[in-house]
Structure formats: structure tokens, C-alpha cells
């Protein structure tokens, strides 16, 4: 038999492949995984390693569990400013409406972000990203949406791109100009959407800063008609879409984004049966955001059983943002998804890997351990995969591999 040459080989590891055709976690006890050119070349039981196989670098996992690298598929982690004062005020009985009228809320983050330089934005945001990376996250989505003007949206997306180019993490950028109406367009939401579609999005897309387009479709955000205009502009530029949908009320957003073949609909506490059916038909991923549910002390759960029965993939993410989910731990988000939403640990881990990849248009690229996929994985000092969604306040991550090379 001809020699088989690999760049790297990990042995003495237990694999949780999370492959779609696997039973449960896709466990392979006492396994091995080989990498060539940044991709998985082989995996299986260590006893089944091909005869004559050789690797330039061999790593002994010491009995660790090895999973796909985690994927945080919905974050707003690039921003300036701090809103802990609002958190304190709300807990002291001040209504959010009073806070907003006094200049707080999302527009306070917009002011702080507009005032920050690109370097200052990067410096403020890096600790949030590094907290995720320390927990085995190898892919992260980062949205704009705290600039609401061309120059600040550009700065936010440039920071996100910089992180992807300079750190061992894959970054997918999402343009969220339709997040709120900025002060200069107060009372003129239609005009603002027109400005985004005609001026801002085309300019940012031309600079290669946008991987997808999102909007906040809600009574306090943008109407379905305004959202559809945003999606039309995105599709004209060849960009996929996703949506903040049905968080506070049923606006038909899930069915709308499904009609556009959207990657995901996110939040979904007020999702209807019609929305579930539309998502199932389109293959749109349901992104669950238990951090926002927790911080807002919501009581209405997304229709988890209906999503399960319809076969809608469910992803789990942090929704890291300064106002409603200041959460930089995907492991804690997984625990919240189990505790608050009653996901199983398997559903939570699959939601932070394979289904999160699909929510970013990366299905078949990452999120599973399979030959041909990028070699992004994490090693864990745990007894079984369910521990990742079980324990709180501990970080059992023993190592991270990005594109086949150790990343920490």
C-alpha cells in the first residue's frame, strides 16, 4: 500500500462528529483525526488508522473529547459604550420607555459607536471576541447596526473583517443597517430604508465588507414592507438574507425571510404555525437566542415542539449585544437553551455547530467532523459531550484547532 501523508494527526481522543447521518453525537471512542491542507483528511477509530499513514506532526489528545469548533452565528459584538446604567435603572423600576426618551437604549450605543475610531472599536470589542474564542468558538458572525450611517457602518464591518484576517477565527459579516431609525431620519423610516438600499449597502458590498443582510422586523423596528425592500436590495447584489423575526410580536417576518430563501430567522418567541411551515419548506434555520429571553425576562417561549415536528434546524447563539444580551459565553447560551427552552444537550451542541454553520451559509464547510470539511475543532476535558451544556461557570476547553493548526 502506498504511504499516506498527512500534515497533522490527533490520537487518543474521543470524537463527537455531530454529522447529520450519525446517531446521537456521532461518538467514536478512542478515535483519531488527520488533517491535510487545512481540511479533515481522515477520521475514525484509532485502531482503524490506515497502514502506512504518516503525519508531519502528531498530537496526543490525552483522552480529551474532540468536537467541531463552536460557531456563534448571531452577535453584535462590535460596538462602543456601556449600558450597565440602564440595566441598573430598569431593575430600580425605571420603564424602558423613560430610558429611551432620555436618550438611552440603542441610540446611546449608536452615539458611542459613531464617536469611536476604528482602532478604538477594535480595542473595545476584542475582549468579547476573545472570550468566545477561549470557549472553543472558531467561527463567529458579527453584525453592524450601531452606526446607522455609511461611515460608522463601514468602520464596524472593517473591524469585523480585521478580526477575521488577524486572529485565528472565521468571521462572517452581516449588514444590519435596518436595526433602528437614526436621529437624522426620525419619523422618516421609509426614507431611511431608501437611503440604505440606494447608497449604504451598495457601497459596503462593493468594498467586500458584507456577507449577508439582516433587518429588525418588529413594531418598534421596521415593517414587513420595509424589510422586503431591504431584501430586494440585498438580492440584487447577490447577498443572502436573514432576519430578526417574531421576537416581540408576530409580523410575519419568518414567512417573509423564508420567501426570500433566507439563511435564518432569529429570536422567534412569537412564531406562528404558518411561519414554522414556511421555514421548513425553505430550509431556513431557526436561531434561538436564550440570552435575550433571559435578560428581558420574557415568558413566551419559541414553539420548540412545532419546529422539531416540522424538521426546522435549530441553532443556538449568544446574541452578544450591549442592551439585551451582554453575553460572551456560547457554553452558557447552550445551558440556557436547555434550561429555559428545554432543548436537549444534543440539540444545544448541534445548534452551536452544524445548524449554526447552516445559519451562516457554511453547511458542509464547518460545524461537523467529516472528511473534506475545514479542520476546525475544539478539545475538551469532559466526561461526555452533554457536559458542555450542563456545567456553568467552568471552561473545559483544552485546545482549539483552526484550519488544521493549534489556535491556542
UniProtKB/Swiss-Prot annotation:
Top-level EC class: hydrolase
Organism: Ralstonia nicotianae (strain ATCC BAA-1114 / GMI1000) (Ralstonia solanacearum)
Recorded catalytic activity of this chain's protein: 4-imidazolone-5-propanoate + H2O = N-formimidoyl-L-glutamate
Gene designation: hutI
Binding-site residues for Zn(2+), renumbered to this chain: 74, 76, 244, 319
Function comment: Catalyzes the hydrolytic cleavage of the carbon-nitrogen bond in imidazolone-5-propanoate to yield N-formimidoyl-L-glutamate. It is the third step in the universal histidine degradation pathway.
HAMAP family hit by this protein: HutI
UniProt binding sites for N-formimidoyl-L-glutamate: 146, 321, 323
Pathway the protein takes part in: Amino-acid degradation; L-histidine degradation into L-glutamate; N-formimidoyl-L-glutamate from L-histidine: step 3/3
NCBIfam families per record: hutI (TIGR01224)
Broad class of where this protein is predominantly found: cytoplasm
GO molecular function, one term: iron ion binding
CC cofactor: Zn(2+); Fe(3+)
Binding of Fe(3+), residues: 74, 76, 244, 319
Family label: Belongs to the metallo-dependent hydrolases superfamily. HutI family.
Pfam families: Amidohydro_1
Coiled-coil features, chain-numbered ranges: none
An example Gene Ontology CC term for this record: cytoplasm
GO biological process terms, semicolon-separated: L-histidine catabolic process to glutamate and formamide; L-histidine catabolic process to glutamate and formate
Chain residues that bind 4-imidazolone-5-propanoate: 83, 146, 179, 247, 324
Stated name of the protein: Imidazolonepropionase
Subcellular localization, as worded in the UniProt entry: Cytoplasm
Highest taxon of source: Bacteria
Known EC number: 3.5.2.7
